[in-house]
Structure formats: structure tokens, C-alpha cells
Amino acid sequence: MSCPVIELTQQLIRRPSLSPDDVGCQALMIERLRKIGFTIEHMDFGDTQNFWAWRGRGETLAFAGHTDVVPAGDVDRWINPPFEPTIRDGMLFGRGAADMKGSLAAMVVAAERFVAQHPHHRGRLAFLITSDEEASAKNGTVKVVEALMARNERLDYCLVGEPSSTEIVGDVVKNGRRGSLTCNLTIHGVQGHVAYPHLADNPVHRAAPFLNELVAIEWDRGNDFFPATSMQIANIQAGTGSNNVIPGELFVQFNFRFSTELTDEMIKERVHALLEKHQLRYTVDWWLSGQPFLTARGKLVDAVVNAIEHYNEIKPQLLTTGGTSDGRFIARMGAQVVELGPVNATIHKINECVNAADLQLLARMYQRIMEQLVA
């Protein structure tokens, strides 16, 4: 017996949509949505394909996701070619199966079933889909959100299909995410010969006390919803490669994953104060990729929890852990934002896979959420 969720997932996987190339994935979704009465608006920016689709009017529930995937890696290590979906022992293998073409298929099929049962639903059902979430994410959801906000578009609830689950579908729901702030710091010294240190100024030596103090800082202790802010040095570079040259510059890149206890400005001020304290000559470039956001218990969280409890008979954990997602952009619209998707154990890995039965279950959960919020 065929399953529409699995069939659509397989069709999407067959399209090697490496960021930001969509390779026809959105056309598949648009065709299905148009048939059930959705209005489609293409919102492409640069090399990225996006679309905004809606049906009905009033209080709005949007489903958000991305059609792009990360590279497959060494294809010889896959049990089957990564863009040829295969089911083995109930597991559907293929790049994007879990992140997040399975979720996209579940969303579309859930919408089809919902509209068939509720052709005159009271609220508005919408889709916000992009082909660039895995790479730069500069021309994707963020640009669509900016355009929607500019015309005062309404968005009350948003369910992002990111693979939130850890062991069984629905065991973890993400109702927020930490902020992400990166510092690209260059400490300036004077290059010279290692035998004549008095004629040079070693930026590595200069910066060592600063870095030692930086990594020892307790930024906050988190709160009921977020773990404590984390700072990690990601890259550090200096020198010419020669053992007799004192470097002229030291480059250090570090990233903060911060809670709602801090703002990005508070972090910047403290780092700059520390640099001044150690009397360093420096240039700095900050990159804020997302503010922290939190969706407290309310209509969306309650609907999601209800759907999971109804179909999987478990009580999900509400967590804000992990990396960033496009939910950080959508939250700017004032919407309640929650992430619910399949198990994430194999995402971005060789032999990415998802339990086929989980995708069927996910479609039913999505449909029940629609029924609670916009039926």
C-alpha cells in the first residue's frame, strides 16, 4: 500500500538540492498546494528560491522549512547513492530524509488532508519555504520575513519542521533558541626576528592574558528556559609558518551562544572593556546571526504538545538547546514559534535516514495542530 508522505519525501530526495539550489523541490510542493486552493507568491532573492503560500484568512498558522540540503560527503560510504531514496528495514535513507524533506512532505500531505476535511476553515494556513537555510541563509527566510513585515503581513503561529526529536518523534520540541554572536578579532603587534624580540611586539604574548581571562568568564547562569551562555574559541591563527619570525598579527574567532539573560550589546561591551584593560591594539568585526527567542506556553505550544500526546502517548520536553534555525527570523514577526520534526540522530551524516513510520506519524501530528488552531 502506497503512502503519500513517503512518496513525496522520495520525490524530494531525488532532487539534489544543495544550498542554495532548489532543483525543482519547491515546484513539487507548489503544484500540490495550488491544487487545494493555496495562493502562491514566489519571493526569490539573489540565488535563492523562496515561496510564501496561503489559504483562507484571519489568524495565521504557517509551516516553515527549507528544501536545501548539505553535501553528501563521500558517496562511496553510503549504503545507496544519497539522492536515490531507499527503504531498508523500515528506514528511509537519503540526503535530506531527516533534514528536512521528510518534514516538508508531512506538511504538504497534512495540509491536503486538512483542507479535504475542513474546506471552509476559519483561519489562514500558510507555508514559508526557502532553498537556503543550510548555507549562508542571507537570501532565504530572513528576506521573506523582512518583505512580509514591510507590508504588515500577519503571522500568529509558526511551526518549523526542523528535526527536533532525539530518540522517537515528538520526544523533544524546540520552543526557543539561543542567540549566536561571533567575534572576529585581530590583535596587532610588530613582526620581527625571534632572536631580536626587543625590536618586535609579539601579539600572541600580548593577547595571552586577555584570552585567559576571556575564557574564564561566567557570562550568566541561564534561566528556567535556557542553559548558561557559552563562549567558545573556534579559530586562532598567527605566524608565517617559519620558526624564526615573530608574528605581526594574531587572529582569534570566538562565538557566543547566549541566553535571554544577555543582549548582544552587553557581550560586546564586556569584550571591548577587557581588550582596553589589557591595552591591546586591535580591530574587531562582530557578526550577529540571531537573537535568542522563546515561545512560552500558549496556544501553539499547547496544540503541539496535545498532538504529540495524542499520537505518540508521550509528554515532550520543551528545550532551547542546539544551534540556530530560521525560527530566529520568524520570531521577529511576533509569532509564536515552535520546532517539531523527526529524529535528528543522522542529520548531515553519511547514511542520513529517518523511520518511515515516523513521517506518517508526523503528518498526523501536523494535521491535528492545524485542526486545533485554524479549523
Curated annotation (Swiss-Prot):
Which keywords describe this protein according to UniProt? Amino-acid biosynthesis, Cobalt, Diaminopimelate biosynthesis, Hydrolase, Lysine biosynthesis, Metal-binding, Zinc
| Cysteine pairs bridged by disulfides in the record | none
Tell me which residues bind Zn(2+) 2.
99, 134, 348
Q: What is its EC number?
A: 3.5.1.18
List of catalytic residues: 68, 133 (proton acceptor)
Checking InterPro entries in the record gives: ArgE/DapE_CS, Bact_exopeptidase_dim_dom, DapE_proteobac, Peptidase_M20, Peptidase_M20_dimer, Peptidase_M20A
Query: EC top class, in one word?
Result: hydrolase
Chain residues that bind Zn(2+) 1: 66, 99, 162
Checking Gene3D superfamilies in the record gives: Zn peptidases
Catalyses: N-succinyl-(2S,6S)-2,6-diaminopimelate + H2O = (2S,6S)-2,6-diaminopimelate + succinate
The protein's job, in short, is: Catalyzes the hydrolysis of N-succinyl-L,L-diaminopimelic acid (SDAP), forming succinate and LL-2,6-diaminopimelate (DAP), an intermediate involved in the bacterial biosynthesis of lysine and meso-diaminopimelic acid, an essential component of bacterial cell walls.
Quaternary structure note: Homodimer.
Q: What is this protein called?
A: Succinyl-diaminopimelate desuccinylase
Q: Which organism is the protein's source?
A: Salmonella typhi
Give the source lineage, highest ranks first.
Answer: Bacteria, Pseudomonadati, Pseudomonadota, Gammaproteobacteria, Enterobacterales
